[in-house]
């Protein structure tokens, strides 16, 4: 079904350092899942191009470096799919999801 996501997304706010070809730029995260994320940037990224993202879901998390595939860009919002997210980084994302869920119950 079109529009159905492979996994649930949840909000995340962190700074992202990006490299796409010759471009190096900053972005602000918007939401994330175990399969990808979206972020806001002024950079123009072609759909189906690859980029490298560096970010920390929380200040106490290790730096995550992941190769991504650009799936969409509408205005300043870019959607990407993770291509090589390591298992331990997926665990940090699951903990982030649990923090978001716990914060929503208060």
Predicted ranges, named:
Residues 14-18, 49-61:
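Short conserved beta-strand and strand-loop elements enriched in small hydrophobics
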Residues 1-32, 47, 94-106:
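N-terminal helix initiation/capping motif
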Residues 38-41, 76-84, 92:
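Short, solvent-exposed secondary-structure boundary/capping segments
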Residues 38, 50-51, 64, 89-95:
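A short, polar/proline- and glycine-enriched secondary-structure boundary/capping micro-motif
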């Amino acid at each position: 079904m079109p529009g159905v996501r492979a996994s649930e997304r949840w909000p995340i706010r962190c700074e992202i350092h990006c490299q796409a070809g010759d471009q190096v730029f900053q972005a602000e995260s918007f939401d994330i899942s175990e399969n990808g994320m979206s972020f806001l940037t002024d950079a123009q990224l072609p759909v189906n191009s690859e980029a490298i993202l560096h970010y920390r879901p929380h200040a106490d998390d290790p730096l995550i470096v992941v190769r991504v595939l650009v799936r969409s860009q509408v205005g300043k919002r870019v959607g990407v799919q993770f291509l090589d997210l390591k298992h331990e980084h997926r665990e940090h994302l699951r903990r982030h999801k649990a923090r978001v869920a716990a914060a929503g119950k208060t």
